[in-house]
Amino acid sequence: PEQTAPYGLGNPPRRRRRSLPRRCQCSSARDPSCATFCLRRPWTEARAVPSRKSPADVFQTGKTGATRGELLQRLRDIS
């Protein structure tokens, strides 16, 4: 009776994340795996590297090393 559960009524209370300076602290400064984990940025802060190519160009030519013309010629040769 002291606490009422709001089943579907309104929005549930949201908890705010505490802003901490670091994820964790290593017990030994010489531990590379701990240092890598503790000092790594969260994925939300990661930034994409800008590219001059469109995503389609990277997908089509990035893995094969072929230019647009070479790719088009290969497709013509197949058919």
From Swiss-Prot:
Q: Does the keyword Protein transport apply?
A: no
Q: Name one GO biological process term.
A: intracellular calcium ion homeostasis
Q: Where is this region: Disordered?
A: 1-23, 51-79
Residue ranges for the region (Endothelin-like) are: 24-39
Q: Which domain of life is it from?
A: Eukaryota
| First-listed, main subcellular location of the protein, grouped into a coarse class | secreted
Q: Name one GO molecular function term.
A: endothelin B receptor binding
List UniProt keywords, sorted A-Z.
Cleavage on pair of basic residues, Secreted, Vasoactive, Vasoconstrictor
Question: Where does the record say this protein resides?
Answer: Secreted
Give the GO cellular component terms, alphabetically. Answer: extracellular space
Similarity-based family: Belongs to the endothelin/sarafotoxin family.
Say what the protein does: Endothelins are endothelium-derived vasoconstrictor peptides.
Q: What is this protein called?
A: Endothelin-2
Q: Which gene encodes it?
A: EDN2
